[in-house]
């Protein structure tokens, strides 16, 4: 029988300030459900390190909120954000990079691409405990061939796209 390979990818995004806005709007139940969704993937993989792999993209705007001490304190009764980030650091997840403020690269000025990419890499290294990110998840799957030289400069080896 032929070998079978399967890649599972998951992208998580949260507009900047949205978790706090939901919490303050009376829709705190929604923020609670969202935060639990961020905690679940790594729990699902625990105990299956020998066979389970996940490619995961966390948007820069989500990472910025997860880093924010005020967000961590506000939601500490729901989930331990530092705890699940620590489990992410130790897990069998391959994180893929992105742009910090979820830019649609082909619609953004090319002069901004490097900064968006570098900012995400700095935050990703800090919060996710990885030095390198081999894959890149373009926000909104916005990709154009002109991005390739920039992505190579930042050490990326592959890009997840839905079509070319």
Regions from the PLM with identified roles:
Residues 1-134, 141-164:
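Catalytic alpha-helical scaffold of carbohydrate-active enzymes acting on polysaccharides/glycoconjugates
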């Amino acid at each position: 029988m032929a070998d079978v390979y399967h890649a599972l990818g998951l992208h998580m995004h949260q507009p900047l300030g949205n978790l706090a806005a939901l919490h303050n709007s009376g829709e705190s139940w929604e923020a609670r459900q969202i935060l639990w969704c961020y905690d679940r993937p790594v729990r699902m993989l625990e105990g299956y390190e020998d066979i389970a792999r996940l490619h995961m993209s966390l948007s820069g705007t989500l990472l910025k909120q997860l880093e924010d001490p005020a967000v961590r304190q506000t939601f500490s009764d729901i989930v331990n954000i530092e705890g699940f980030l620590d489990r992410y650091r130790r897990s069998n997840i391959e994180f893929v990079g992105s742009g910090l403020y979820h830019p649609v690269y082909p619609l953004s000025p090319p002069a901004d691409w490097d900064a968006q990419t570098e900012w995400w890499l700095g935050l990703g290294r800090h919060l996710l405990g990885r030095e390198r990110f081999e894959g890149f998840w373009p926000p909104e799957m916005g990709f154009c061939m002109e991005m390739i030289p920039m992505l190579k400069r930042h050490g990326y080896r592959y890009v997840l796209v839905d079509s070319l």
